[in-house]
């Protein structure tokens, strides 16, 4: 097989003093952090779609990249060539996992029959590639949003035949994910929303997608899939409003359909930005609700109202995220997937490496800062002190349901309560955070 990235053997850790742009400066996979290898903490994955499927096009311009597998030709032959390049990239980047949508790896074809045939062929190819390279599948998913049939959604479509086509894709992608040893299966409702309420029945669409998710859970248990099911929240784009708006919205949906113990969330940083939240907020909310699963590590531009999918470069932002994850015990089946793409002007094929190397170094630095925060314990102590009253007799009686509203009012009056405001010490804690970051 002819090498595509023929000027590079493999990316390795060379340390912070190295001037080699094709080396890791902070990500040392074997370095121990809190007693665990850095690679095991971070569980990096590269994505198939932005890295190998995007051609550099945007709403105002055609594709700017010269990718041999994106040229005219036999679709399956080109898909196999793309797989060759993808796994060469995964190996040379030294990344342990990858992620895909069904039509990232396989031509959709002109019919459902062709789709099923092509995906079966490419599942065989991926299985062989994983075996020979040692690269594993973090998660698979089905693209039920790009084709025109999904213009009005997939599970929320007004036509049950479109719903059925989407069900076939998810059924097939779940089976492929299980066969390939995928540790999770993701459901992103790219067009599960609306553009106008003038032609939308909200109750009907909610019932449809609720039943769809129940079917997915039923299939998981029927087949014995051991991975985690994940929903990926996003507030809008491409629709005006999406039903999986943010983590809290997804939790409400899961509770409505009795799925809160079955499905967790895959949180993307850029989607948090679009929802008006910090990345930190969405991670902390998911952990608090018991539905944290995995992360799409990227960044958005707060000055732009769309999904820019840039590589993460903020150690400060991601240290807070990794702090929450470490406090919660770390990843189980999830990991850090780089749902990020090089810029349209980044036309050198090695720009793919520069983007991922910088992101991996950023997350490694963030992990080390988060580990200092955990070990030092000052933030934990400050928060514990702030809520200490809830561990006392009054707080415990309230939480345990031993006091009614009337009884509590009588207690407050009888004890002549006159609580005094206590400083939240935000500025002090922000200064402490800077010391963790910069020494």
From Swiss-Prot:
Q: State the organism named in the record.
A: Serratia proteamaculans (strain 568)
Q: Name one GO cellular component term.
A: cytoplasm
Q: Where does Mg(2+) 1 bind?
A: 232, 268, 296, 339
| Binding residues annotated for Mg(2+) 2, in chain numbering | 268, 271, 307, 309
Matches recorded under HAMAP family: Xylose_isom_A
Quote the catalytic activity from the record.
alpha-D-xylose = alpha-D-xylulofuranose
Organism domain of life: Bacteria
**Gene Ontology biological process terms, A to Z:** D-xylose metabolic process
Assembly and binders: Homotetramer.
Q: What enzyme class is recorded for this protein?
A: isomerase
Q: What is its EC number?
A: 5.3.1.5
Identify this protein by name. Xylose isomerase
- Give the main localization category: cytoplasm
Cellular localization per UniProt: Cytoplasm
Q: Which gene encodes it?
A: xylA
Zinc-finger recorded as keyword? no
Cystine pairings recorded for this chain: none
Q: Catalytic center at which residues?
A: 101, 104
The UniProt keywords, alphabetically, are: Carbohydrate metabolism, Cytoplasm, Isomerase, Magnesium, Metal-binding, Xylose metabolism
Co-factor requirement? Mg(2+)
What NCBIfam families does the database record attribute to this sequence? PRK05474.1 (NF003998), xylose_isom_A (TIGR02630)
Q: How is the cofactor bound?
A: Binds 2 magnesium ions per subunit.
Sequence similarity: Belongs to the xylose isomerase family.
């Amino acid at each position: 097989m002819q090498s595509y990235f023929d000027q590079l053997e493999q990316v390795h850790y060379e340390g912070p003093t190295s001037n080699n742009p094709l080396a890791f400066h902070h990500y040392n996979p074997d370095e121990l952090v809190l007693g665990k290898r850095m690679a095991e903490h971070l569980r990096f994955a590269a994505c198939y779609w932005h890295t190998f499927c995007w051609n550099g096009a945007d709403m105002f311009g055609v594709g700017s990249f010269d990718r041999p597998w994106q040229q005219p030709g036999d679709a399956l032959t080109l898909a196999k060539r793309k797989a060759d390049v993808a796994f060469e990239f995964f190996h040379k980047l030294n990344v342990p996992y990858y992620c895909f949508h069904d039509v990232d790896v396989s031509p959709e074809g002109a019919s459902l029959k062709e789709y099923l045939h092509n995906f079966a062929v490419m599942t065989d190819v991926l299985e062989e590639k994983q075996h020979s390279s040692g690269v594993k599948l973090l998660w698979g998913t089905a693209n039920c949003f790009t084709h025109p049939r999904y213009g009005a959604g997939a599970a929320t479509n007004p036509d049950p035949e479109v719903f059925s086509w989407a069900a076939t894709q998810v059924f097939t992608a779940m089976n492929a994910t299980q066969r390939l040893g995928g540790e999770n299966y993701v459901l992103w409702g790219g067009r599960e929303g609306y553009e106008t309420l003038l032609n939308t029945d909200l109750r009907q669409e909610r019932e449809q997608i609720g039943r769809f998710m129940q079917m997915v859970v039923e299939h998981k248990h029927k087949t014995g899939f051991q991975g985690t099911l994940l929903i990926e929240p996003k507030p809008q784009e491409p629709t005006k409003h999406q039903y999986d708006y943010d983590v809290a919205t997804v939790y409400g949906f899961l509770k409505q359909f009795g799925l809160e113990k079955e499905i967790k969330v895959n949180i993307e940083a850029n989607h948090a930005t679009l929802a008006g939240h910090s990345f930190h907020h969405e991670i902390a909310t998911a952990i608090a609700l018991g539905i944290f699963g995995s992360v799409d590590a990227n960044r958005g531009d707060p000055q732009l109202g769309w999904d820019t999918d840039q590589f993460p470069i903020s150690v400060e932002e991601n240290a807070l995220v990794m702090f929450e994850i470490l406090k919660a015990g770390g990843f189980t089946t999830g990991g850090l997937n780089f749902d990020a793409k090089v810029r349209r002007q980044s036309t050198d094929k090695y720009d793919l490496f520069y983007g991922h190397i910088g992101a991996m170094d950023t997350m490694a630095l963030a992990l080390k800062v988060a580990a200092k925060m955990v070990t030092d314990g000052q933030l934990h102590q400050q928060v514990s002190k702030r809520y200490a009253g809830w561990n006392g007799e009054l707080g415990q009686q309230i939480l345990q349901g031993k006091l009614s509203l009337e009884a509590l009012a009588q207690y407050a009056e009888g004890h002549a309560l006159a609580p005094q405001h206590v400083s939240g010490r935000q500025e002090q804690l922000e200064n402490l955070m800077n010391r963790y970051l910069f020494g």
